[in-house]
Amino acid sequence: MAGEVSAATGRFSLERLGLPGLALAAALLLLALCLLVRRTRRPGEPPLIKGWLPYLGVVLNLRKDPLRFMKTLQKQHGDTFTVLLGGKYITFILDPFQYQLVIKNHKQLSFRVFSNKLLEKAFSISQLQKNHDMNDELHLCYQFLQGKSLDILLESMMQNLKQVFEPQLLKTTSWDTAELYPFCSSIIFEITFTTIYGKVIVCDNNKFISELRDDFLKFDDKFAYLVSNIPIELLGNVKSIREKIIKCFSSEKLAKMQGWSEVFQSRQDVLEKYYVHEDLEIGAHHLGFLWASVANTIPTMFWAMYYLLRHPEAMAAVRDEIDRLLQSTGQKKGSGFPIHLTREQLDSLICLESSIFEALRLSSYSTTIRFVEEDLTLSSETGDYCVRKGDLVAIFPPVLHGDPEIFEAPEEFRYDRFIEDGKKKTTFFKRGKKLKCYLMPFGTGTSKCPGRFFALMEIKQLLVILLTYFDLEIIDDKPIGLNYSRLLFGIQYPDSDVLFRYKVKS
């Protein structure tokens, strides 16, 4: 009854407001936005670029061509400047020798505050902002993504790859045509999900995975909007899709999954310690972990395959390297799936790794972001800069990745860019000085992706199988650009797709 009265009152008030009242409300809202951007540069602060749009600031310029726009600002204002972007003031530090200013100031520049706010907006996880102990315990679970635990994951992953490839793809003896992005997303999603979460044992697992993947991709498509300040109610059916995915991780559904990984089991144990049994926020945590596991791996796999398909010399070098490794370990490609490579053997494939790193260099827009907890002065060799409490400070690696002083012809794909004298190349220079950071697709410092080893091994394993067992040819041999829809978050989508064809080698 109270709800009906409230709703009726709301309608009555809106009607009474009329057009003049609505115009006044709109004017007041515009005034509030203008007051928000009335900020002026204080002495000691970096140059301030607010753009001409209230609240949005420079977002349209940045979305159009991020790298060119940032390089233009760098040329005009230097390596450090502050921009208004979607209601937030972000100070960008572009000099790679000043990155430590962001990385080392843990107390004043917080990743946790920023990430917890992001988790609440994107996945509806609220408790992490209040419970630091749970945050710390969940962080400890990442130990199961490295060392011996990673070896166990890789073994499980290989078994899952066999079950995906043997009954379906290995029967493709004549040419089959597919779009590259759906091909990559289908395989990566299934392999990742079954390796981490296990398989559903009481229903059609393939149908479950297919439906979950489709819902996940719809959710991920709106991720950039979710983490902005746009209300989720304005994003179509994203809220209902998110709720549907979260319910896939209810205690009832989890009981039907067999083959949990150590990292998933440990996270579930921590969550059950801090939440009541049926709390849907447990499922929200699992959705967040699923997003972190596949949202960047899928486009990385796409770009790695795309560049190998378009560059025959790269494909030939990687295939030759894989063949030599198989011969040296006494393994042969036969019927079924006899190939088995350890983590150390996968790490020895330097042409393959260099090709993946080069694809990441060209497609990664992963931005290291910190929340300023108190007014702070950043002191560097080139000067001191003041940043304000409540602002954000960021490192924008695409400027580093596209620097011709560091990478010759940075717009080109060169599969051997990270190889020197037959070994992994880890030494790069700028202004005659060695760089500590030269490739940053996984972030840096406290925000460095804890699942990077798992993701790289997954892509390496999958590429080894595809290049060993299949003939692969690109049909649409055309240049593909970046979509920029996930501007500051991870690996960018392609702005279009390409057709390729594949068949089992005779």
From Swiss-Prot:
Q: What does this protein's UniProt record list under function?
A: A cytochrome P450 monooxygenase involved in the metabolism of endogenous oxysterols and steroid hormones, including neurosteroids. Mechanistically, uses molecular oxygen inserting one oxygen atom into a substrate, and reducing the second into a water molecule, with two electrons provided by NADPH via cytochrome P450 reductase (CPR; NADPH-ferrihemoprotein reductase). Catalyzes the hydroxylation of carbon hydrogen bonds of steroids with a preference for 7-alpha position. Usually metabolizes steroids carrying a hydroxy group at position 3, functioning as a 3-hydroxy steroid 7-alpha hydroxylase.
Instruction: Give the required cofactors.
Output: heme
- What is the membrane topology here? Multi-pass membrane protein
Which Pfam family, just one, is annotated for this protein? p450
Keyword Oxidoreductase appears in the UniProt entry: yes
Keyword annotations from UniProtKB, A to Z: Cholesterol metabolism, Disease variant, Endoplasmic reticulum, Heme, Hereditary spastic paraplegia, Intrahepatic cholestasis, Iron, Lipid biosynthesis, Lipid metabolism, Membrane, Metal-binding, Microsome, Monooxygenase, Neurodegeneration, Oxidoreductase, Steroid biosynthesis, Steroid metabolism, Sterol metabolism, Transmembrane, Transmembrane helix
Q: Which organism is it from?
A: Homo sapiens (Human)
Question: What does the annotation give as the result of altering residue 198 to R?
Answer: In SPG5A; uncertain significance
Instruction: Please report the name of this protein according to its UniProt entry.
Output: Cytochrome P450 7B1
Name the residues that span the membrane: 17-37, 289-309
Q: Which reaction does it catalyse?
A: 25-hydroxycholesterol + reduced [NADPH--hemoprotein reductase] + O2 = 7alpha,25-dihydroxycholesterol + oxidized [NADPH--hemoprotein reductase] + H2O + H(+); (25R)-cholest-5-ene-3beta,26-diol + reduced [NADPH--hemoprotein reductase] + O2 = (25R)-cholest-5-en-3beta,7alpha,26-triol + oxidized [NADPH--hemoprotein reductase] + H2O + H(+); (24S)-hydroxycholesterol + reduced [NADPH--hemoprotein reductase] + O2 = (24S)-7alpha-dihydroxycholesterol + oxidized [NADPH--hemoprotein reductase] + H2O + H(+); (24S)-25-epoxycholesterol + reduced [NADPH--hemoprotein reductase] + O2 = (24S,25)-epoxy-7alpha-hydroxycholesterol + oxidized [NADPH--hemoprotein reductase] + H2O + H(+)
- Disease entry from the Swiss-Prot or TrEMBL record: Spastic paraplegia 5A, autosomal recessive: A form of spastic paraplegia, a neurodegenerative disorder characterized by a slow, gradual, progressive weakness and spasticity of the lower limbs. Rate of progression and the severity of symptoms are quite variable. Initial symptoms may include difficulty with balance, weakness and stiffness in the legs, muscle spasms, and dragging the toes when walking. In some forms of the disorder, bladder symptoms (such as incontinence) may appear, or the weakness and stiffness may spread to other parts of the body. Congenital bile acid synthesis defect 3: A disorder resulting in severe cholestasis, cirrhosis and liver synthetic failure. Hepatic microsomal oxysterol 7-alpha-hydroxylase activity is undetectable.
